[in-house]
Amino acid sequence: MKFTITRINKQNKLMVSSKTVERFLERIAKDDAKLSVTNFRMSVPLMEADYQYYKGIKEWQHVYPAAEFNKDESGNLVFQKSNGLVMLHFINLMSDQEKDAVKKTVSLLPMTFAAFEGADGRSLIVLVSICNEEGKIPTKEADADLLYQSAYEQVKTL
């Protein structure tokens, strides 16, 4: 299984790469040489939960755990393969106790694939495994889209 990672470079061009789940988890376990996450977390208390204006945020990488994508000749993302993962993002967890409580709860669920702290230090990202009624991950984009919509409807009230 691979995650798709995108970013916009300084020439405003979409860059696309894929990383195995193992490589991705190794990579997020430590900060980069510019201490991007550390500096961001220091700035978070000064912001009002609106991170879009944080310096350099547009150059940050964006991760798509739900599916693998490639880029076509026009620079658009094109679906390749579904990973059968839904991302749940729990926000505004202000204390370690709140984060630990959510981590403990999701660790007890058999469908939890992974859970990790968000870049802001105040959120938890949980990847949940999903499949269709036959226990399979859809191979076609339209089928995957329907499965993701169904899964979203089931968990949006959490």
Question: Model-found features: residue ranges?
Answer:
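Short, surface-exposed ligand-recognition loops at beta-strand->loop->(often short) alpha-helix junctions
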Residues: 89-98
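Helical (often loop-to-helix) elements that flank the catalytic cores of nucleotide-handling enzymes
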Residues: 102-105, 130-158
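Hydrophobic, Leu/Ile/Phe/Ala-enriched alpha-helical segments that form helix-helix packing faces
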Residues: 47, 51, 106-110, 155-158
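Catalytic micro-motifs at enzyme active sites that drive phosphoryl/nucleotidyl and oxygen chemistry
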Residues: 72-78, 102-119
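A broad structural signal for short, well-ordered beta-strand segments within beta-sheet-rich domains
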Residues: 80-83, 93-94, 112-114
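Histidine-centered divalent-metal-coordination microenvironment in nucleic-acid enzymes
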Residues: 88, 113-140
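DNA replication initiation on ssDNA origins
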Residues: 1-84
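Alpha-helix initiation and N-capping motif
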Residues: 18-21, 99, 152
